[in-house]
């Protein structure tokens, strides 16, 4: 695993920055697997994992040392044991034709390919319930 860059985020948090989402997911899995007391939260994003700590329980320097050590562990990112969720999608957005044109397919083909793909939430955004989806099919 690549050594992440550490970016301070005040006295109670820091970001671990890597190059891409495919590095974030195993990094998050490694951190979650060895999470010590004092780590309040682990928040994955597109290229970072935010680590929030309680400095009364785990000094920030010790937290950074733990995180960098955990980052050297190779872990597979595992999907949570939850059943798939199927959603009804209306493929009638104003940008459907433009998106299809960019992909050099027609709107029906774009809708078919999108509907047949398996998607998973890689991380959530700042708005409650807004998940960023990824698919191995795209």
Where are these regions (language model features)?
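Conserved "landmark" site that anchors the functional core of diverse proteins
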Residues: 1-138
